[in-house]
A protein has these predicted regions:
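A generic structural signal for short hydrophobic patches within well-formed alpha-helices
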Residues: 11-12, 41, 115-116
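Active-site neighborhoods of divalent-metal-dependent phosphate/nucleic-acid chemistry enzymes
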Residues: 66-117, 124
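Short, well-structured N-terminal submotif of metal-dependent ribonuclease cores
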Residues: 1-36, 48-58
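Short active-site oxyanion
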Residues: 1-2, 31-34, 63-65, 102-107
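Hydrophobic beta-strand scaffold residues
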Residues: 34, 123-126
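Short coil/turn segments
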Residues: 15-16, 40, 85-86
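Active-site-proximal, substrate-binding regions of enzyme catalytic domains
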Residues: 21, 35-80
Length: 127
């Protein structure tokens, strides 16, 4: 089963038809399972509001299987920060991906350069 953890940057690019969104769509469609923290929904809806886009992102997020950690992610957060600095929301998404797949067999999809670098250093594949 091909699975990927999806960072908000990918769905924001698709929602706003940003440069590279066609590549992102193809990549998303190539996976059988798409995973993300429910933080993705908040980030996507906030971006839509900021840009005054009235469209409901429900269709974009309908393919996502939500991950709800049942414990603090202190260990995963420490692992990410020991690898390198990323901002808070980017850190959370990487930590949740480690929670879901500590063996790093899933892909980590992001358009954020720094987050991609750290995800690769952690051993995740990408787009």
């Amino acid at each position: 089963m091909r699975a990927a953890y999806v960072d908000s940057s990918c769905l924001v690019a698709v929602a706003f038809s940003e440069a590279g969104s066609t590549r992102v769509k193809r990549s998303l469609q190539s996976f059988e399972v798409l995973l993300s923290s429910n933080l993705l929904e908040a980030e996507l809806r906030a971006a839509a509001r900021r840009e005054s886009i009235a469209a409901d992102p429900a269709q974009l997020i309908s393919a996502i299987s939500w991950v709800y950690p049942d414990r603090p992610l202190t260990s995963e957060i420490t692992t990410v920060l020991d690898t390198g600095y990323v901002r808070g929301a980017d850190l959370w998404h990487l930590a949740v991906a480690l929670f879901v797949d500590p063996h790093r067999e899933i892909a980590f999809l992001t358009l954020n350069t720094r987050q991609r670098e750290i995800s690769q250093q952690l051993g995740f594949s990408g787009m």
